[in-house]
């Protein structure tokens, strides 16, 4: 993705206001940082499509993901983005391997899951159940499907 990323979010809630107007490169690494409660997670939820009750526009090159004026909102599953929640939610009744495959059912990938498993060093965890994983292991398992979707 070499296109420019345009993000304009204007969100007003009773105890929270977020206004952000950014133009970011479509390649490389961008870091979003700030104090607790400043809106980092909310902004990422807007980009991912998990929050849609805001005024503004999100576009990746010519692809418009959200435009409140035009009433155009792309569904979450149509956005090529990897999103990993702060709390790694895994299905406790499934093995790690089953959790990984479940997370990819709706998103055909160009990159095989095996590459993510190797990259994150979780191959030895595949037969284990989530309740036996440490917090860091759970997080790496949650990251693997996001990487495999080629975000």
Residue ranges with predicted function:
Residues 63-68, 108-125:
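Conserved ABC ATPase "signature" region
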Residues 143:
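Hydrophobic anchor residue at the start of the ABC signature
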Residues 93-103:
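Short coil-to-helix segment of the ABC ATPase nucleotide-binding domain corresponding to the Q-loop/switch region
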Residues 65-82, 106:
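ABC ATPase NBD coupling module
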Residues 129-133, 137:
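Conserved ABC ATPase signature
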């Amino acid at each position: 993705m070499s296109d420019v990323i345009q993000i304009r979010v204007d969100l007003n809630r009773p105890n929270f206001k977020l206004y952000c107007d950014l133009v970011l490169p479509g390649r490389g690494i961008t870091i979003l940082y700030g104090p607790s409660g400043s809106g980092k997670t909310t902004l990422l939820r807007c980009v991912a499509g998990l929050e849609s009750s805001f005024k503004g526009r999100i576009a990746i090159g010519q692809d418009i993901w959200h435009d409140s004026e035009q009433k155009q909102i792309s569904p979450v599953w149509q956005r090529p983005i990897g999103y990993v929640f702060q709390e790694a939610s895994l299905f406790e009744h499934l093995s790690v391997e089953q959790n990984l495959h479940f997370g990819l059912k709706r998103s055909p990938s160009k990159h095989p899951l095996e590459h993510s498993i190797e990259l994150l060093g979780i191959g030895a965890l595949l037969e284990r159940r989530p309740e036996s994983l440490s917090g860091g292991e759970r997080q790496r398992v949650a990251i693997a499907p996001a990487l495999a979707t080629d975000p």
